[in-house]
Amino acid sequence: MDRRDRIGDNLMKPCETSTQGALVSINGSETEGTFPTLTTSRLSLREVLPSDAPSLFTVHGDAEGMRWFGTDPMTDIAEADKLVQVFADWRRSGSGVRWAVERLSDGLLLGTCGLFRWNRKWRSCVVGYELATFARGNGYMREALYAAIDYGFDVMQINRIEAQVHPQNAASIQVLETLGFVREGCQRQAGYWRDAYHDLLQFSLLRSDCVRRG
């Protein structure tokens, strides 16, 4: 049996005290040229497909729900089609992987998450994610990130995962801190969207953080 099929037994977990959202299985591997589908107790993290564009447009077109995401809200379905292509290009170029977060109970797309800006020499990357407004408050993104980060540390052999979050995005900050991310500082006016500059908080999670706390 491949060690990735025994994910619940031996592989390193993110720095979280609860086991909810533990990665159950991996099918495929980015390092082996096949898209890695991750499964948790409630979610399937799978490849983002062209057929997902309408759902992505619904998520990204929600101006209030996406106000801290870092881009202007979508106004045309063509923008969602382009985003699907961007995620596919990440994989082809080897710069990262983006998963569609799908609820197992009904196959509904809840959002996406991923690891990108993958610097293989430095063993670092950035984590990004977004969740539909209707799905928030249920721990879905924490569960999805738990699996994605586990994959990053074990399969991609990442040492440092970074995240940038708007200071007013309290829910996202809470998710990161629950997973063990450490706040490193504030990047002043590092982002620009909706005709305004925005400060961004810098977070990181190291492999050694999990070893010390694990």
Q: What spans do the regions from the language model cover?
A:
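Conserved GNAT-fold acetyl-CoA-binding loop/helix
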Residues: 64-86, 97-99
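A generic secondary-structure signal
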Residues: 86-87, 151
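Short loop/turn motifs at secondary-structure junctions and domain boundaries
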Residues: 89-95, 181
